[in-house]
Amino acid sequence: MSAQMPGVQLARTVTSAAALGFVPVAIKFGLFDLLVEIEKPAHRKEVLMAYEKSVGSDRKSMPCLQLIDDALYAMAGLGFVDMTVDCVYSANDITRHLVHTPSAQHGALHFTTEALLAGAFLMRRLESGGYRYPFEELHTPLQFAYHEMGNDELAQQHTYDIMAAEGRIDSFNRFMVGKFMKTATAPERLARFEYHLDPVLQDAKSRRVIAMVDIGGGRGEMMLEFKQAFPDLSDKDLVVQEFNHEIREIPGLTLSTWNYKENDSEQPIQGAGVYHLAHILHNLPDLDAARLLQKLSQAMHPQSRLLIHEFTKNANNAKMHASMIALFGGRERSASEWRQLAALAGLRVTFEAYPEGGEGLVEMRKL
């Protein structure tokens, strides 16, 4: 029995790929929500009837019974729903989590749409380029996939632009709001790492500069957490720099625009107390990450801090690492890799925390 386990584990892992392709199908037809609403084990026909009832007279793209069954069966194989030997399906803890945390469904959709497509073309992308590696952000397996599918227009665009053109960016933004689960707030996480933010904020106040800037901060979720934790901070003290033109206002915060990818674009906010980069650098190849850090270094005061919020590079996050490579040419980074990037930008690592799970923290200051 034990001698078979490595083979069993291997088979379970590598045969997941096609099953993951059914995740968008399950989400499209609301199968997770339907199983939770039914509240009891259900045959495939009961699930289809519940779906038909939910859409009412709108019968466009109605799935057949076999598609419902195969999608549910694939979800059972992934552990997302439970099933009996009689092919009766029911919600489990993961099903309920997907329903009660809507952003998790959007995340599942992202990784089984864009990331799954990119992963399928990774080896062919390497072969086509004579195994040149690492990838540049406009020449990843995802762009190669669109090239091979005959869409040369999208094959020349950045992954985010591809998602926008495919009508997928709103879903991705919804994922980024809540991600796969609700974790500790940013202030709670920093406190757990015994990182003391108060002296930095006091210094910014004494220098009469902006307290914190969140670069690529989306809709300001992290800055709002800091505002709640530090009620003395005003709207003007907390700036979100975003280049998503769909975001035009963030109540309680100051919104500004900075496209750090433009070659001649300097960081417009000089000498702030803290500059935040949360899940930005893992989207970037090393050279692009170094350029961004250099721009921030040039804007920083000797007392300024750069706080980098990224996942720890360990076995727990290896799949995320692979996803960043395939989608963006980016990567998660180790302590030594952070120090190398810091040195290239005239910075030094002055604090670091690498938890086994969840987001870590790296602080950099000017040399």
PLM region descriptions:
Residues 101-308, 312-316, 349:
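Conserved adenosyl
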Residues 25, 283-286, 332:
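Short, solvent-exposed loop/helix junctions and linker helices
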Residues 305-345, 349-353:
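C-terminal alpha-helical "lid/dimerization" subdomain adjacent to the S-adenosyl-L-methionine
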Residues 1-153, 203, 346, 356-357, ...:
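N-terminal accessory segments
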Residues 44-48, 281, 335:
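An amphipathic alpha-helix signature
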